[in-house]
Regions:
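Periplasmic N-terminal accessory/gating domains of Gram-negative outer-membrane beta-barrel systems
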Residues: 89-91, 96-113, 126-250, 288-291, ...
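Transmembrane beta-barrel wall of Gram-negative outer-membrane proteins
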Residues: 256, 293-378, 401-425, 614
C-alpha cells in the first residue's frame, strides 16, 4: 500500500543414553507450549526403590523406580533440587544442587559416587566436577538458553533483544522499527522483525497490534531466557521467525534481596560523526552538512531492586523486582526538519510472582508484570547556517516515540500432576496496553520535505514551522490481549503424548492516526516539468505534468482510525517416541484458525479452514554415549494477521493528495499563489482509492485468501571434543510459501471482469486495495450495481507479477567450552543468505511499518527487478562471548560480534523514461533509469563490535558487594547500518539519497555497583 511519508522439551538431554530411552515411564521428556519447565531423570537404582525430589521452592514429589531401574520427573519448575534415592523408606544415596534449565532435562543417575558431583545437568550452565561437555541427544529444536548467572556476567544491553542476539541466526533489525517501549528489534532466521513471538512465564506478550516486539521482564528478574531459532514443536505457533521466551525468578525457602545502580555518564560517551550529503541537490551540495550529530549526547541511569522468599515455608513464596531506567538525550535532527530535541525517557519495569504449592500434586503460579515508557521532549529550532539553537518551539508531539506506552499483564498458571504419567497445565492471563501521544496544540499544517521547495522562493533555505509531525495518534488508544491455553501430557510406554489448545483474543480500541494541525499537511516535491506526475491521461491515478521548473506541492490528507479485534484459536498434538536406545522421533501437528474483525465487528478475514502445520524431528545418538548427535527436523509455521491490518485494509481510511503549482512560500512554509494541477478526479487523488468511505468487509480481501506460512528444514550435528569442548554444525533452509499483502491494481481487476463478459456499466466502485496472496491467482468480490457482487478471477499473469520468493539459507558452525568453574566461552560462525522479492510483513529499506500493506505488490511496476538480497540478510556473522574468573575476586567477560553489512537499495522512478505510473514516487527498482535490484549498488560496511566488562567482588564484603565497569564498542567503530535509498530521478534528484540513516553506537562506558544478600 502506498506510503510516501515513510520516514515518519522434550527434554531428555544428554544421558548416557541407554537411559534416555524407552523407559516404561515414558523415557522421553516433554516441552510444554510455555517452555517454562524442565525434567529430571536417571537410572542405576533397583526395582522397588523410590526417588524423591525436593526443590528450593518447596516442591516435593516421589516416584517409583521401574523394572529397568529407571525413573523420571516431568514438567518441573526451573530451580535447584535435591534428589534422594530411597530403599525401604530410608535414603541410601543423594544428589544436591541439581539445577534445571528451561526446556531441558537433567540426568541424575545413581552409582558408587555418592557426591553431588555425579549429577549431570544436561546442557545446563551449572557444571559439576565430573561433568562432560553437553551434547543433547533428545531435543530436536534449535535453541539458545541464557541463564541469570550468564546475564550477570556478560556485557549486554539490558533488553531481551540484546540477549537474543547471542543466538545464531539472530541479527539486529532496522533502526526504523522498535518495540512497545522503544526497544530495538531483531530478525531471526531471515524473518521480518514482526514474525517473532514473545513469552513471559508461558504467556504470549507479543505486540498484539502489529507484532513489533513484545513486553519483557526487568533484567534482574530474568531467571532464564531461551531463543528458539527453528525446529520448535507443535506447541508453538504464530511465528515464522523465532521465539523469545523468558522465565522469571521465583521465591525460595531462603529470603534474598538485592539492589543495583548502573550509570552511563555523558563524559565516557564518544561523539558520533556528522553526516553529509553525498550527491548534489537543487539547494544542497555533496559534502554539505546534512545531520549535525557531533553534539548528540546521552546519559543513562538504572536503579533496580528485588526481594524474594517464603511467605509460608515449603508452601507459599513471593518474588518482587522493580527497575527504573532514566535516559537524557540531546539530539539534533537533519536539514529535512532542523530542530534540537532535549529528551527525557523514564522506563519503569515491575515483576511479581506468587508460587503456591497447594500440595505435592498441584501448583498455582500467579504472575504480574509491567513495562512502560514515558517520553517527554522540548523542541527548539536549529539554524544549520550558524549551527546555533533557536527558540523553543514546544513539546515533541510527533508520536515517534509515543509519550506514554507499555502494558500491564496478569497471569495465573495451574499445574496438576494427576498421576506420575499424566500432567495438566492451564494458563489464563490478560495484558492491557496503553498508547498515548500528545496532540500538537497548533492549527498550522506540517511541512513535509521542505528541502524540495523551490529555492527561488525560500531564499535558498528550507522553511518549515512549529508543527513537528504529519500524523497524530488517537490519545485514547488502548488494547487488551487475553490468552487461555490448556496442555495435557501423558506417558505411555515409549511415547510421551502432549496435546493442547492455545486461544488468544485481542481488542484494539481507538487505534490509528490522523493528519495533524488543521487535518492536512503540505508536501513539497520536484518532478520532470514535462512528464505526468502520476499515471497517464485517462487513468484513475493521473496527475498532469507540473510544468515550469518542475516544482509543485500537494495537500496531504490522512485519516485511518478504528476499534477492531482479532480472534485466534489453535489446537495441537505431539508425540515424542523413543524408537530405541539411539533414536528419538518427534511428530506433531498444529491447526490454527484466525479471524480478524473490522471497526463494526464484521469479519473481513476468516481463515478458519484447517491450517495443518506438521512438525517432524529426529535425533540419532550415533555412538550410544552422547558424544555425537545427528539431528534433523522439518516443519510448517503459520503466521497470524495482527489487529492493525484492519485500519487501512478494512476500515474507513482517507488518504489523498491534491496537487498545485505555487508562486510563493510564507513564513510558516505554507505555499501561496496556488494553481490546481489537472488530476483524474479534478481534485484529490488516492492511489489506493482511500476516499474515506466505509469499507465493505466482503471487498477487503480475496475470497481465496490463505494464511501466510513458511516451510523449514534443518540438519545438524553436535560432537564432543575431548572432555572440555563441544562443537557442531547446522544447515537451515527456510522458504516462505505463502504471504499476505495488499494489491492496488484495480485496472487489472476491471480487465478480468471484462474478459469474463461482465458489462462494466453495471460494476460498482472497485476498492483501491485488496488483501491477497502474492504470486497466486485470486478471486475478488466487486459490487454489482444491480445488486450482489461479481467475482473477478485474476491470475498472477493477469497482474503481471513474478512468483513470490523469500528463501533463507544458513550454515552455522560453533565451538563451545562449558563453564568449568574458571571460564566459559562460545565461538559461532554463520554463513547465510536471505534472497527474494518479499521481506515479509514490513519493509526495512524504506522503514514501512504497514503490516501486510507494503508498497510491494501494489502494482506490477514495483516488482520489476525486486528480486535480490533482502534487507535482513547478513552473509557473514561471527559471534564470540564468554567469561573468565581471573582471580577469586576478579572476573572478566566479553562479547564480540563481527558482521557483514546489509544490502543497499537504489529506488527511483520507473523505467528508462523515469515515469511514475502509480503516483507513488521513487519506490521503483530503478536507479536513474537503470534496473536496480536490492543489493546491486553494494552493501553497507562490515561492523566490528567488541564489548568488554570487568567485575570486582571483594571477599571482605563476603562477595555480596560487586563493582562493575563495562565498555561497549571498545574499538569505537562508526559504521553505517542503513542509508537513504530513494534517489529520485535524473531531472529531479532526491538530495537525501545515500545519506546515513543509522550507524553503530559510538563507544560508551557503564559503571555499576550491586549488593546481593
Amino acid at each position: 500500500m502506498s506510503s510516501r511519508s515513510i520516514r515518519q522439551a522434550s527434554v531428555l538431554r544428554r544421558s548416557s543414553l541407554a537411559l534416555a530411552l524407552a523407559i516404561s515411564l515414558g523415557g522421553t521428556g516433554v516441552v510444554l507450549a510455555q517452555s517454562t519447565t524442565g525434567n529430571i531423570f536417571g537410572t542405576g537404582a533397583q526395582p522397588g526403590d523410590t526417588v524423591q525430589i525436593s526443590g528450593s521452592t518447596g516442591i516435593t514429589r516421589e516416584v517409583p523406580v521401574d523394572a529397568s531401574g529407571r525413573y523420571q520427573f516431568n514438567n518441573l519448575p526451573v530451580g535447584s533440587y535435591q534428589v534422594d534415592l530411597k530403599r525401604n523408606g530410608a535414603v541410601v544415596d543423594s544428589r544436591k544442587n541439581v539445577n534445571l534449565t528451561v526446556g531441558k532435562g537433567s540426568d541424575v543417575s545413581f552409582n558408587a559416587a555418592a557426591s553431588a558431583g555425579s549429577a549431570q545437568s544436561l546442557d545446563s550452565v551449572t557444571v559439576t566436577a565430573n561433568s562432560l561437555p553437553p551434547v543433547d541427544v533428545s531435543t530436536v529444536d534449535s535453541r539458545t538458553v541464557i541463564t541469570s548467572e550468564q546475564l550477570a556476567k556478560l556485557p549486554l544491553a539490558r533488553t531481551a533483544e540484546a540477549i537474543a542476539l547471542l543466538a545464531p541466526g539472530a541479527v539486529a533489525g532496522s533502526g526504523y522499527f522498535s518495540g512497545p517501549t522503544g526497544n530495538a528489534l531483531v530478525s531471526i532466521g531471515g524473518g521480518s522483525v514482526t514474525e517473532n513471538a514473545y513469552y513471559i512465564n508461558g504467556f504470549n506478550t507479543t505486540d498484539p497490534l502489529s507484532g513489533f516486539g513484545g513486553i519483557t521482564l526487568p533484567y534482574g528478574a530474568i531467571d532464564q531466557q531461551e531463543v528458539l531459532a527453528g525446529g520448535y514443536g507443535a506447541a508453538y505457533g504464530r511465528s515464522a521467525g523465532g521465539v523469545i521466551s523468558q522465565v522469571g525468578k521465583r521465591g525460595t525457602n531462603e529470603w534474598h534481596f538485592g539492589a543495583q545502580i548502573l550509570w552511563e555518564p555523558r563524559g565516557t560517551r564518544s561523539t558520533p560523526g556528522n553526516d553529509h550529503y553525498i550527491i548534489n541537490g537543487d539547494s544542497t551540495s555533496a559534502g554539505e552538512l546534512y545531520n549535525y550529530n557531533k553534539k548528540d549526547t546521552q546519559m543513562r541511569t538504572v536503579e533496580s531492586a528485588y526481594v524474594g522468599g517464603p511467605l509460608i515455608k515449603d508452601k507459599l513464596y513471593i518474588f518482587l523486582a522493580a527497575e527504573q531506567e532514566r535516559v537524557n538525550q540531546d539530539r539534533y535532527t537533519s536539514q529535512d526538519a532542523p530542530n534540537y530535541y532535549d529528551r527525557t525517557y523514564r522506563n519503569p519495569k515491575f515483576y511479581g510472582k506468587l508460587d503456591w504449592n497447594i500440595n505435592d500434586s498441584n501448583i498455582l503460579e500467579v504472575t504480574g508484570a509491567s513495562n512502560k515508557q514515558n517520553y517527554d521532549a522540548n523542541v527548539y529550532g536549529f539554524d544549520y547556517s550558524t549551527l546555533t539553537r533557536g527558540d523553543r518551539v514546544g513539546k515533541d508531539t510527533s508520536g515517534n516515540p509515543l509519550n506514554k506506552s507499555g502494558a500491564d499483564l496478569y497471569t495465573a498458571k495451574f499445574t496438576s500432576y494427576i498421576t506420575d504419567d499424566l500432567t495438566l497445565t492451564v494458563l489464563y492471563g490478560k495484558m492491557h496496553g496503553t498508547y498515548y501521544s500528545q496532540v500538537p496544540q497548533t492549527q498550522t499544517p506540517h511541512i513535509i520535505t521542505p528541502n524540495n521547495q523551490d529555492p527561488l522562493l525560500n531564499g535558498g533555505s528550507p522553511i518549515s514551522n512549529e508543527n513537528p509531525t504529519t500524523r497524530v495518534f488517537d490519545p485514547q488508544h488502548k488494547s487488551t490481549n487475553t490468552n487461555f491455553r490448556i496442555d495435557l501430557s501423558y506417558h505411555i510406554g515409549d511415547h510421551t503424548i502432549t496435546a493442547g489448545m492455545d486461544n488468544q483474543d485481542v481488542r484494539d480500541t481507538n487505534d490509528g492516526q490522523g493528519t495533524s494541525g488543521p487535518g492536512y499537511a503540505w508536501e513539497y516535491q520536484k518532478h520532470d516539468p514535462n512528464t505526468p506526475i502520476a499515471g497517464a491521461p485517462g487513468g484513475s491515478t493521473y496527475v498532469a505534468a507540473p510544468g515550469g521548473a518542475g516544482f509543485y506541492v500537494d495537500r496531504y490528507v490522512y485519516d485511518a482510525r478504528a476499534s477492531v479485534r482479532v480472534k485466534q484459536r489453535a489446537q495441537y498434538i505431539e508425540d515424542s517416541w523413543q524408537v530405541n536406545d539411539r533414536w528419538l522421533v518427534k511428530v506433531g501437528l498444529r491447526n490454527d484458525q484466525f479471524t480478524n474483525y473490522n471497526g463494526v465487528s464484521q469479519p473481513y478475514l476468516r481463515l478458519t479452514s484447517p491450517q495443518w502445520a506438521p512438525r517432524l524431528g529426529a535425533t540419532w545418538d550415533v555412538n550410544g554415549d552422547s558424544s555425537l548427535k545427528i539431528y534433523a527436523n522439518a516443519g510448517r509455521y503459520y503466521l497470524a494477521m495482527p489487529a492493525s491490518v484492519a485500519l487501512r485494509s478494512a476500515g474507513q481510511s482517507l488518504y489523498t493528495r491534491e496537487y498545485f503549482n505555487y508562486t510563493g512560500i510564507d513564513a510558516n512554509g505554507i505555499p501561496t499563489g496556488l494553481t490546481p494541477i489537472e488530476t483524474a478526479t479534478g481534485g484529490p487523488i488516492s492511489s489506493n482509492r482511500e476516499y474515506g468511505l466505509p469499507r465493505d468487509p466482503k471487498t477487503a480481501a480475496s475470497t481465496s485468501l490463505k494464511s501466510e506460512y513458511q516451510d523449514e528444514f534443518i540438519l545438524g550435528f553436535d560432537k564432543t571434543l575431548g572432555d572440555k569442548w563441544v562443537y557442531g554444525a547446522k544447515a537451515t533452509v527456510r522458504k516462505l510459501k505463502n504471504a499476505i499483502d495488499d494489491v492496488g491494481d484495480s485496472d487489472a481487476i476491471t480487465a478480468a471482469l471484462q474478459r469474463q463478459g461482465v458489462d462494466l456499466a453495471t460494476v460498482g466502485p472497485i476498492q483501491g486495495s485488496y488483501l491477497f496472496n502474492p504470486g497466486r491467482a485470486s478471486d475478488f468480490m466487486v459490487p454489482n450495481l444491480n445488486g450482489g457482487y461479481y467475482t473477478a478471477h485474476v491470475t498472477n499473469a493477469d497482474f503481471g507479477f513474478p512468483q513470490l520468493k523469500r528463501n533463507y539459507y544458513g550454515l552455522e558452525m560453533y565451538l563451545e567450552h562449558p563453564f568449568d568453574g574458571k571460564w566459559y566461552g562460545k565461538l559461532d560462525y554463520l554463513y547465510s543468505k536471505s534472497y527474494g522479492n518479499s521481506e515479509g510483513q514490513v519493509r526495512s529499506d524504506i522503514g514501512q511499518q504497514d503490516v501486510s500493506a507494503t508498497v510491494d505488490w501494489d502494482y506490477p511496476q514495483f516488482m520489476d527487478y525486486a528480486s535480490g538480497e533482502l534487507s535482513n540478510s547478513r552473509k557473514h556473522v561471527i559471534k564470540a562471548y564468554g567469561s573468565y574468573q581471573l582471580a577469586d575476586e576478579w572476573m572478566l567477560s566479553g562479547n564480540v560480534t563481527v558482521a557483514s553489512g546489509a544490502p543497499k537499495s537504489c529506488l527511483g522512478l520507473y523505467g528508462a523514461d523515469e515515469s511514475d505510473p502509480t503516483g507513488y514516487g521513487s519506490y521503483y527498482h530503478y536507479c536513474y533509469g537503470e534496473p536496480s535490484a536490492p543489493g546491486k549498488v553494494g552493501h553497507n560496511p562490515w561492523t566490528w563490535l567488541v564489548d568488554l566488562s570487568a567485575e570486582y567482588r571483594p571477599t571482605w564484603a563476603d562477595k555480596k558487594l560487586a563493582f562493575n565497569v563495562t565498555v561497549f564498542n571498545v574499538l569505537n567503530t562508526r559504521e553505517r547500518l542503513a542509508t537513504y535509498p530513494q534517489a529520485g530521478g535524473i531531472g529531479a534528484v532526491d538530495p537525501n539519497y545515500r545519506t546515513t540513516l543509522y550507524q553503530t553506537t559510538p563507544r560508551y562506558a557503564r559503571f555499576g555497583i550491586s549488593y546481593d544478600f
